C-alpha cells in the first residue's frame, strides 16, 4: 500500500522552517542565478519575522516541537529549471508589452489616456503556431508559447486550443491546475483537454473535452512549473496575479478575434486561492481587453478556517461514502480541530508569515495526516493510491509524453525536462504564509460584478464537498441570506434526464456537487463535467 503524497499536502507538510532553529540557504547548484530574485522571498520572510511577538514565537516553538520533520525539510528554496531560450526568429509572433502600453487614445472628455491599463512594459508574449498534424492532440487551431517577464526573468508556458464548435463566437476559458506547483498540462491530458495519454504513449480522443464549445488556454503557472521556468521564484498568489493579467492582455492583443468573446477563469484545488485573486486583478483594470464574465472553482481550497472543520466528517463516513478512519483516529481529529481553528483565526487576523505558517503545518498534520497515513487516495475516498507519488499512474504517462523531444519541439518548450508537479514551489508558497491566507474575502467583491461557480466531486477528501459547500454558505456578501436558504436541487443531463449531481444558486453565487466525482471531476465524470461547463457558460445559473 502506498502512502499518498498529495500535491496539496506534500509541500505543506514539510514546508516551514523555524527561524530560531534553521538558517535558510540557497541551493548549491544554480544555473544563470539572479541572486536578487531568489533573495526576495528570504528577505520578505526575514522582514516579517522582525515583528515576531513572544506569543507568536511560542506558537512557532510549539508547532516545531510537535512536528520537527515538517520544519526541518524546508531549509532550501528550489533550484531554477535548466533551459535554453530559443531565438526570436523561431517564433511566429512576438507581442511586446511596451508597444501595447504606448498606445494612447482620446476619451469622451477629449483627454489622452492609455488604451489599456496596467504595467506591461516588462512583458512580452511569444507565439508559435502548433501544427495539429504533428502531435495529433486535436485537429483544431492551436497556439503555444511563453509570456516573458523580462524584468523578473519569468517565463510562463501556455497552450491554446480553439473551440471545436464555433470559435468565432464561443467563449474562451483559462484553465489552472493547483498544487501550488502542478502543471495545467495535467488538466489538459488527464481531465478536460482534447486527448488523454494512454499507457503505451498513444493519445486517445476525448469526446467530452471542454473545447467542445469553448476555446481553452492551459497555463503552466507559477514559474518553474511544467514547461515554465525562471531564475527566480514566485511564492504568493497576489504576485502571480500580475502575470496572468499581462498574459491575457497580450494574448488578446495578438488575437483580437477572441477578445470580444466572453472569457472565464476555471481551475481546481489550490486554484481556489488563485482564481479569486486573478479575477480581482483583471477587474481592477477598467480599461482592459479581457471580457471576464465568470469564474469556476473546482474542489478548491479557498477558506481554510471553514473547510478544515470538514476533514473529520469526510474521513469518518459523514460525506456520503464509507469511513476511511477508525473511531480513535476520528476522535483524535475532533480533539485537534479547536487548536487548528485557533491558529487559522490568528492567521486570518494578521495575514503574516509568523501566524500563517504554523497554522498550515499544524492543521495539515493534524487534519490531513491521519487520512494520508492510511494509504488511501486523498483525491478519492473510494480508492487506494496507485504507484505514482500522486496516486494516479496516468500522471506518469503524461510526463513521459511531454518529455518526448518531438513533443517539446512541436510546442516550443524551452526547459530541459517536464515535471507534472514541483513540490518545492508548494513549500515556497507555504513558507510565505500563502497557504492559509483568507482569499475567500476577495469573493464578495467578485460577486458584485460576475457570477461565481464553486463545484466539487463528492468523493474527494483533500478539498471535499462538505467544506466547499460550507464556506460558500458562510461567506458574508449582500446575497448571503438568500443563498444560504436556497435548496439543493437535482442536476441532470439534458436529454436523458440522468441525475449527475445537485446544485444550489442565488444571485451570482452557485454551488454544485457532482456525484461519484473525485478531486478531478472531469477525470472521473467527463460527461457530467462537460454538461456543467456548457450550461454554466451559457448563463443558465446566472441572475
UniProtKB/Swiss-Prot annotation:
Keyword Signal: yes
GO biological process terms held by the UniProt record: proteolysis
Signal peptide (residue range): 1-17
Catalysed reactions, as listed in the record: Release of a C-terminal amino acid with broad specificity
Disulfide cysteine pairs (residue numbers): 182-421, 316-330, 340-363, 347-356, 385-391
Enzyme Commission number: 3.4.16.5
Coiled coil: none
Keyword Cytoplasm listed: no
Subcellular location field: Vacuole
Any one annotated GO CC term: fungal-type vacuole
Active site: 269, 460, 519
Keywords: Carboxypeptidase, Disulfide bond, Glycoprotein, Hydrolase, Protease, Signal, Vacuole, Zymogen
Propeptide: 18-128
A Pfam family matched in the record: Peptidase_S10
Residues carrying a glycan: 213, 508
A single GO molecular function term of this UniProt record: serine-type carboxypeptidase activity
Main location: other
Functional summary from the UniProt entry: Vacuolar carboxypeptidase involved in degradation of small peptides. Digests preferentially peptides containing an aliphatic or hydrophobic residue in P1' position, as well as methionine, leucine or phenylalanine in P1 position of ester substrate.
Entry similarity comment: Belongs to the peptidase S10 family.
Protein's UniProt name: Carboxypeptidase Y homolog A
Source organism of this protein record: Phaeosphaeria nodorum (strain SN15 / ATCC MYA-4574 / FGSC 10173)
Source species taxonomy: Eukaryota, Fungi, Dikarya, Ascomycota, Pezizomycotina
Gene name per UniProt: CPYA
Amino acid at each position: 500500500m502506498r502512502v499518498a503524497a498529495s500535491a496539496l499536502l506534500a509541500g505543506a507538510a514539510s514546508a516551514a522552517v523555524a527561524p530560531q532553529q534553521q538558517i535558510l540557504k540557497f541551493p548549491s547548484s544554480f544555473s544563470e542565478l539572479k541572486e536578487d530574485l531568489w533573495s526576495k522571498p528570504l528577505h520578505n520572510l526575514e522582514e516579517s519575522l522582525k515583528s515576531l511577538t513572544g506569543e507568536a514565537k511560542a506558537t512557532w516553538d510549539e508547532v516545531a516541537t510537535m512536528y520537527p520533520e515538517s520544519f526541518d525539510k524546508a531549509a532550501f528554496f528550489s533550484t531554477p529549471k535548466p533551459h535554453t531560450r530559443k531565438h526570436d526568429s523561431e517564433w511566429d509572433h512576438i507581442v511586446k508589452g511596451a508597444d501595447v502600453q504606448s498606445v494612447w487614445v482620446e476619451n469622451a472628455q477629449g483627454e489622452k489616456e492609455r488604451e489599456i491599463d496596467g504595467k506591461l512594459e516588462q512583458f512580452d508574449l511569444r507565439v508559435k503556431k502548433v501544427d495539429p498534424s504533428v502531435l495529433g492532440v486535436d485537429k483544431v487551431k492551436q497556439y503555444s508559447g511563453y509570456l516573458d517577464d523580462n524584468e523578473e526573468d519569468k517565463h510562463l508556458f501556455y497552450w491554446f486550443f480553439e473551440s471545436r464548435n464555433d470559435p468565432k463566437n464561443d467563449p474562451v476559458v483559462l484553465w489552472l491546475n493547483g498544487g501550488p506547483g502542478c502543471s495545467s498540462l495535467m488538466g489538459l491530458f488527464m481531465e478536460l483537454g482534447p486527448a488523454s495519454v494512454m499507457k503505451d504513449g498513444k493519445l486517445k480522443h476525448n469526446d467530452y473535452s471542454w473545447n467542445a464549445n469553448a476555446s481553452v488556454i492551459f497555463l503552466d503557472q507559477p514559474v518553474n512549473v511544467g514547461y515554465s521556468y525562471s531564475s527566480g521564484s514566485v511564492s504568493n498568489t497576489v504576485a502571480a496575479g500580475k502575470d496572468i493579467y499581462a498574459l491575457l492582455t497580450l494574448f488578446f492583443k495578438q488575437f483580437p478575434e477572441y477578445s470580444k468573446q466572453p472569457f472565464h477563469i476555471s481551475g481546481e484545488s489550490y486554484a481556489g486561492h488563485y482564481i479569486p485573486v486573478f479575477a480581482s486583478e483583471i477587474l481592477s483594470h477598467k480599461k482592459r481587453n479581457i471580457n471576464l464574465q465568470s469564474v469556476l472553482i473546482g474542489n478548491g481550497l479557498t477558506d481554510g478556517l471553514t473547510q478544515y472543520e470538514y476533514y473529520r466528517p469526510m474521513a469518518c463516513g459523514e460525506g456520503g461514502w464509507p469511513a476511511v478512519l477508525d473511531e480513535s483516529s476520528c476522535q483524535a481529529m475532533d480533539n485537534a480541530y479547536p487548536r487548528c481553528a485557533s491558529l487559522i483565526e490568528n492567521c486570518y487576523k494578521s495575514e503574516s508569515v509568523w501566524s500563517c505558517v504554523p497554522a498550515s503545518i499544524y492543521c495539515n498534520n493534524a487534519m490531513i495526516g491521519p487520512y494520508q497515513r492510511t494509504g488511501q487516495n486523498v483525491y478519492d475516498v473510494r480508492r487506494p493510491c496507485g504507484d505514482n507519488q500522486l496516486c494516479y499512474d496516468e500522471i506518469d504517462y503524461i510526463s513521459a509524453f511531454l518529455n518526448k523531444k518531438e513533443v517539446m519541439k512541436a510546442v516550443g518548450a524551452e526547459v530541459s525536462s517536464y515535471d507534472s508537479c514541483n513540490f518545492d514551489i508548494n513549500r515556497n508558497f507555504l513558507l510565505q504564509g500563502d497557504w492559509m491566507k483568507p482569499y475567500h474575502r476577495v469573493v464578495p467583491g467578485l460577486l458584485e460584478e460576475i457570477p461565481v461557480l464553486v463545484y466539487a466531486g463528492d468523493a474527494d477528501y483533500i478539498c471535499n464537498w462538505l467544506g466547499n459547500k460550507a464556506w460558500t454558505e458562510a461567506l458574508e456578501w449582500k446575497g448571503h441570506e438568500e443563498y444560504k436558504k436556497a435548496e439543493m436541487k437535482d442536476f441532470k443531463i439534458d436529454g436523458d434526464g440522468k441525475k449527475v449531481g445537485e446544485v444550489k444558486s442565488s444571485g451570482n453565487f452557485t454551488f454544485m456537487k457532482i456525484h461519484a466525482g473525485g478531486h478531478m471531476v472531469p477525470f472521473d465524470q467527463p460527461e457530467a463535467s462537460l454538461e456543467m461547463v456548457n450550461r454554466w457558460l451559457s448563463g443558465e445559473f446566472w441572475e
